[in-house]
Regions:
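Small-residue-rich transmembrane alpha-helices
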Residues: 147, 183-252, 290-293, 588-647
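Alpha-helical membrane-protein architecture signal
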Residues: 133, 171-176, 180, 223-227, ...
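C-terminal transmembrane helical bundles of large multi-pass transporters
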Residues: 462, 500, 504, 508-601, ...
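Mid-to-C-terminal secondary-structure elements
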Residues: 2-129, 202, 291, 316, ...
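Conserved G/P- and acidic residue-centered "switch" motifs that form tight phosphate/ATP-binding loops
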Residues: 7, 37, 145, 168, ...
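Interfacial "coupling" helices/loops that link adjacent transmembrane helices in transporter permeases
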Residues: 142-186, 264, 551-593, 597, ...
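Hydrophobic alpha-helical transmembrane segments of multi-pass inner-membrane transport and secretion
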Residues: 124-159, 234, 238, 268-294, ...
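Alpha-helical transmembrane segments of integral membrane proteins
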Residues: 116-121, 149-176, 180, 200-322, ...
Length: 660
């Protein structure tokens, strides 16, 4: 019986959240299905967006007898008190028994039991750790700026606080006041940041909906708001202590000379904070620069086929009307014939398109090679093709011939291998004419290698191609394997190609849905989604750090200029020109900048090694990135110094001296 459970999203989208849909019949692929339930909004499969849940053996009723086909993954919930090690031991015993009962298909199989979280996060864990670290560095820079601001504020209020201390205000009261002011600034900044994050997360999800696992579940909610409030409060207290202690120190009650000497010491403290800001910004800028360099390199990597003007459409034939190879092959032949009859259009089919990440692999045996123990056989990725696939995709032929219409179910089983297959398994021999078969077949079917084609980046532009064999669809298809990818090359990438594909499909089967249609250029771009996400997000953090560091050095230099107004006025009255004043003030700032950049370079040299797994074709210590970032940061920081220096050079010496 065909029963289906609706996902929450499609229930809301297509049926408006109507609870009466339960028990009713809907048409899926032209066949009636009974709705028996609706999933809650909180449920989602770890790696996929799913709208409909159906019984496995209804969707694939003939898959069970083919024991050599292993394409399913299981999810277990451990009983209370059962450890992962115990579960692995139990599962190993089950697989050993399966191998004894079915040696031709299951002998040598080893289960891999991993925590679901590890399976979901996978290689994203390092990216997440780096992004969290980047957030922490930006927070530290912001906190240093807050401390700098408060120390400048305390220095400006020196007279007021000295009088209050002289009149009996306790140290605790003065420290409390400064801490309250810091907390107010931090909480207001945190509130503004939360509002910006609510907007930023929406923009991020619209641009990168699937860059990381479960990214769609990220949002600015009450828990995030509470964390933001507590983090703002904690940082205000932590980084408000130094200004508060300065405000309550005994030197505030001193004479003017002592106050000025204290101001000099405070200036040194603020300078140290600025140096730390520049160093932290340097680390973030280097990290962002490396990821941008990686992205630039990946975009120049040839995928192994020509993407321009090629459209890909996913076609999944419903089991209710296409339950055997004959009906499936008839549909595919008619579709290819209809499309290839259109002027300037060429079409073909393949089991999985390049860069999709989807692939089927088989353990295999090469004829004439020494026997290999069951379970130790090498594996190879298999791709079933139909039509003139290699010419549609313009994948170069290196040796032998391509697959053609003469390769039928009744003829010799043949295959075309890629160059990676030749390099790994036939490094010193001619692969043409050699035969291979799948391991664990009840009735072995030998595949003769008739051609060699160029490598195609199937698993990503950063991933090297693995050994693969292309076989004719009619020779490799199974009754249960009803999905395929249609690839169509049109005249000059015609914008109407997608509508043409839909029209041709509807002409053969009006009820058949097409899940997705994408240009291959888009497929290539989508394969870089995670790299673009990492690079752009870290660049945003680095730009924020650069801005904060420049604000910090601007504030320190502005405070320095204000403190030295009398000195500058005297020097200008004695003949010092504006240019000399600017040079000397900028030189003071350059000392801080050089020290910060030096410390930042040393820190980045060590920390960027943690990013090695995210880098492709770029060394963690890439000299061009380090030098370029150092020059960028130096230029921005010098500009932040020049503005207050320029203002100082324009003061009227007589006005300053009269004020003093």
């Amino acid at each position: 019986e065909r029963e289906v459970v609706l996902g929450h999203a499609i229930w809301k989208r297509e049926w408006g959240g109507d609870p009466s849909i339960v028990g009713k019949t809907i048409l899926l692929g032209g066949a009636p299905w009974t709705v028996v339930g609706v999933m809650g909004p909180e449920f989602a499969l770890p790696e996929q967006k799913v709208d409909l849940y159906v019984p496995l053996w209804v969707a694939y009723p003939v898959a069970a007898p083919e024991r050599g086909v292993h394409f399913l993954r299981s999810v277990f919930r451990l009983k209370p008190g059962v450890t992962a090690a115990a579960a692995r031991a139990d599962l190993a015993g089950v697989f050993a028994e399966l191998g004894r009962l079915h040696p031709e298909s299951d002998k040598g199989l080893n289960p891999d039991l991993v925590p679901l979280l590890d399976n979901v996060v996978g290689d994203s864990r390092r990216s997440l750790a780096i992004l969290i670290g980047a957030v922490g560095l930006v927070l530290l820079i912001a906190c240093a700026n807050l401390a700098n601001l408060q120390m400048t504020n305390v220095s400006a209020r020196n007279s007021e606080l000295s009088i209050r201390a002289a009149l009996g205000a306790s140290r605790r009261r003065i420290v409390s006041q400064i801490l309250v002011e810091s907390a107010l600034l931090s909480v207001l900044g945190g509130a503004l940041g939360f509002l910006l994050s609510a907007w930023g997360v929406g923009a991020l999800l619209s641009r990168f909906p699937e860059a990381l696992p479960r990214l769609g579940n990220v949002g600015a909610n009450l828990r995030v708001a509470g964390f933001t409030f507590l983090a703002s409060l904690a940082t205000s207290i932590l980084f408000g202590v130094a200004p508060g202690w300065q405000a309550a120190s005994g030197r505030l009650t001193g004479l003017l000379g002592r106050a000025r000497s204290g101001a000099l010491r405070d200036g040194a403290a603020r300078g140290a904070l600025v140096v730390s800001e520049i160093a932290l910004a340097m680390v973030l800028l280097v990290g962002a620069g490396l990821l941008l360099r990686v992205l630039w390199r990946l975009r120049s990597v040839p995928p192994g086929f020509e993407t321009r003007g090629v459209l890909a459409a996913h076609i999944d034939l419903p089991q209710s009307r296409y339950d055997d190879k004959a009906t499936q092959s008839m549909f595919r032949r008619r579709l290819l014939q209809s499309l290839n009859e259109q002027p300037g259009v060429s079409a073909a089919l393949i089991s999985e398109i390049p860069l999709s990440g989807d692939a089927l692999d088989h353990d295999f045996v090469i004829e004439g090679e020494p026997p290999i123990a069951p379970g130790d056989e090498p594996s190879i990725y298999t791709r079933s093709v139909m039509g003139d696939y290699f010419r549609v995709m313009r994948i170069p032929l290196r040796a032998g011939r391509l697959l053609n219409e003469g390769d039928r179910e009744s003829t010799e089983y043949v295959g075309v291998v890629n160059e990676s297959m030749v390099r790994r398994y036939f490094p010193h021999s001619n692969p043409l004419g050699r035969r291979l078969r799948w391991a664990r077949q009840r009735e072995p079917e030998w595949i003769t290698i008739v051609g060699v084609v160029g490598d195609v980046r199937h698993f990503g532009l950063a991933a090297a191609e693995e050994p693969a064999v292309y076989t004719p669809y009619v020779q490799s298809a199974r009754d249960w394997k009803r999905w395929s990818e249609l690839v169509v090359r049109g005249p000059g990438g015609s914008s109407g190609l997608g509508e043409l594909v839909r029209r041709m499909v509807r002409g053969i089967d009006p009820l058949l849905p097409i899940a997705r249609i994408r240009w291959m250029d888009q497929v290539v771009g989508d394969s870089l989604t995670r790299q673009r996400f990492n690079a752009e997000l870290l660049t945003i953090f680095a730009a924020s750090a650069l801005l904060l560091a420049c604000v910090g050095i601007f504030g320190v230099m502005w405070s320095t200029v204000r403190r030295r107004r009398a000195e500058i006025g005297v020097r200008m009255a004695l003949g010092a020109g504006p240019a000399r004043v600017v040079r000397e003030i900028v030189a003071d700032g350059l000392r801080l900048i050089a020290l910060g950049i030096g410390i930042g370079l040393a820190a980045a040299f060590g920390l960027t090694r943690l990013m090695a797994s995210l880098l492709f074709g770029v060394a963690p210590t890439d000299p061009a990135t380090f030098v370029g970032v150092a020059l960028l940061l130096a230029a921005a920081a010098v500009l932040a110094c020049w503005i207050p220096a320029r203002r100082a050079s324009r003061v009227d010496p007589m006005v300053v001296l009269r004020a003093e």
